[in-house]
Amino acid sequence: MQYVSWDDQYADALCELWNQELGDRFPMRTELMRQNSFEDQNVVKAGSWIAVDAVTQRPVGFVVAKCWQERLDIQLGKGIGWIQVLLVSTAHRGQGVGRELLARAENALREQGVEKVLLGRDPYHYFPGIPDESAEVKAWFERQGYHSEDRLENDLLGQYPEPAELELPEVPDGRFRLLTREDEDAFLTFLHRCFPGRWEYEVIHYFQRGGTGREFVVVELHGEIVGFCRINDANSPFIAQNVYWAPLFADGLGGVGPLGVDAEYRGRGLGLAIVEAGIVALRNRGISNIVIDWTTLVDFYARLGYRSWKQYAKYGKTFS
């Protein structure tokens, strides 16, 4: 077995390997793999490797390690590293390939000062944990010193077989509306005040990638933004997490979330209402399948007809 440094010339072959192993559940697109695993500035090149069969010269496994490396005023995961993905072909398992890839990733993360490694949950992640049905994968990582953490995370699915033209909900003393490019500064100020961290980071990237605002429904009270809901579809400026697996749906996929309401205005039903507003906006674009990703609030969203579609077990490992 040969181990070669992370190199985007292998992107198509790695995408093919992924789909060979996971494509029925999590169909990969080369565009998505390049976006999340090659273009992300947080990829640790010294910890990301490709296992290549010495005879066929085809990739049979790979690992992607990340830690925070961006030069922004915010930081995600101080002291945290991530294994974005570790995949070995079924035919090459049980030969130590996975252990070698993981060791290389962990050693590089240690050298970056990482104190704890999480599986998934990285910037530009694929998964918030190990797909819960993958019992053998969970057992393998447990043997490597990883421990299950907290509750299962869920991707939820809502489906609307009948097309509809709907009106945005009404709110006393305010309104729901789509964001515009001119709202960028006010929206980022709101997020920095109310939701600093990952959601703020994702919106910074959204506008940097040419976002126009159409991916956000906001609620305004007395002219001030007090809540938001992100919505994604095939026309978004990059592939967002709740539409990663759109190829599973012949008639397309939309996504809702994240969402949040200023703490001062909670308890008024605005959270559920802004989700409804996001759903209305997507349905008016002709979208009949909608995913809400990475949540434990299954009962909350069940009120809108959403059910758990995929589940993920969160795992981490603290370096001693």
Language model region names:
Residues 267, 273-320:
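Short hairpin/turn module used for nucleic-acid contact or packing/dimerization
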Residues 61, 150-152, 227, 310:
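A structural microfeature
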Residues 19, 23-48, 61-78, 195-260:
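A conserved beta-strand-loop-helix scaffold within acyl/acetyltransferase catalytic domains
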Residues 1-16, 175-187:
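A short beta-loop-alpha structural element at the N-terminal edge
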